[in-house]
Regions:
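C-terminal helical cap(s) of enzyme catalytic domains, especially alpha/beta-barrels
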Residues: 235-250
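Acidic/histidine-rich catalytic cores of soluble enzymes
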Residues: 10, 111-206, 211
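Acidic (Asp/Glu)-rich catalytic clusters
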Residues: 1-7, 26-49, 67-82, 114-119, ...
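Charged helix-capping and loop-helix junction motifs
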Residues: 26-34, 64-70, 99-110, 169-178, ...
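Hydrophobic faces of well-ordered beta-strands that scaffold small-molecule active sites
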Residues: 11-13, 48-52, 83-87, 124-126, ...
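Short glycine-/acidic-enriched loop or helix-start segments at secondary-structure transitions
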Residues: 22-23, 135-136, 236
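Structural motif corresponding to the early beta-alpha repeats
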Residues: 2-105, 163, 194-196, 231-232
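A short, acidic, flexible beta-alpha connecting loop/helix-capping segment that sits on the rim
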Residues: 226-237
Length: 250
């Protein structure tokens, strides 16, 4: 409610921050579907997506397994007519993929997850964490080769340039963002670090937010943007500051 009152239009519901809408941890995590329904019914003027961590780059997710199927069900509930499930694999990666041949076979199992999600009308996006934005874009392009055109359209990337700046500092995060085709953008993340340390709001720092906004504007991106604001007693004030800062860059 506070986020909406400060101008938020879209909320990402993130695993481990869901209160009575989730139970269990790790492989035992499950959504509480009825509570999700009650939550979104209370905010008809907001849109939502669901975000969960899964070992999707190591082939460790069964598309027919209970956890993934439950996540898809929850995504449909919270996303209403435009369901969207965002995945992130938090496991560290040995090296950044620079060409399609670098991608291990097990990572291509994302195509199976995308096919299952698409069969239920759900957009599936993969966030860059242990890999760069460019590497995840390579993965999506490779997986799309295994999918129908309609299935492929529902698979994309959740780019987070700040993740890349922190974890792959020798790469060009915003260059990767600019190179990615518009149809791969499903949702974007804004957050900021300064001298490698997370800030409490989005402001000037190591990530060039002005260039990020310029790239998104030049591409014609109109999808949701998520502001990742660390927990703090002034979290909603920090959210308002972040909105104002980024809006001032356009």
């Amino acid at each position: 409610r506070d986020a909406r009152d400060r101008g938020a239009k879209h909320i990402e519901l993130r695993q481990t921050f869901l209160g009575n809408c989730e139970t269990g941890k790790g492989e035992d995590w499950r959504p509480v579907i009825g509570n999700f329904q009650s939550l979104v019914d209370g905010f008809p003027d907001l849109s939502f997506n669901l975000a969960i961590a899964m070992p999707c780059l190591s082939g460790g997710v069964d598309p027919k397994g209970e956890m993934f199927q439950q996540a898809l069900t929850a995504a449909k509930v919270v996303g209403r007519e435009a369901p969207h499930l965002r995945l992130v694999d938090p496991a560290p990666q040995d090296k950044v993929w620079e060409r399609p041949g670098d991608i291990p076979e097990e990572a291509l199992s994302v195509a199976d997850l995308a096919r299952e999600a698409a069969a239920q009308g759900i957009t599936l996006s993969v966030e860059n964490s242990g890999q760069s934005i460019g590497a995840i874009a390579l993965l999506v392009a490779k997986c799309r080769e295994q999918l129908s055109e309609e299935e492929g359209k529902l698979l994309g990337v959740c780019p987070d340039p700040t993740n890349q700046i922190r974890r792959q500092p020798d790469t060009d995060a915003l260059g990767d963002l600019e190179a990615m085709p518009l149809d791969m953008f499903k949702i974007v993340h804004f957050k900021q670090v300064r001298d490698g340390q997370a800030l409490l709001d989005v402001d000037d720092g190591d990530m060039d937010c002005a260039r990020m906004v310029q790239i998104l504007d030049s591409k014609g991106y109109t999808g949701p943007a998520i502001f990742e604001i660390p927990s703090h007693q002034d979290v909603f004030e920090n959210l308002s500051k972040s909105f104002a800062y980024v809006e001032g860059l356009s």
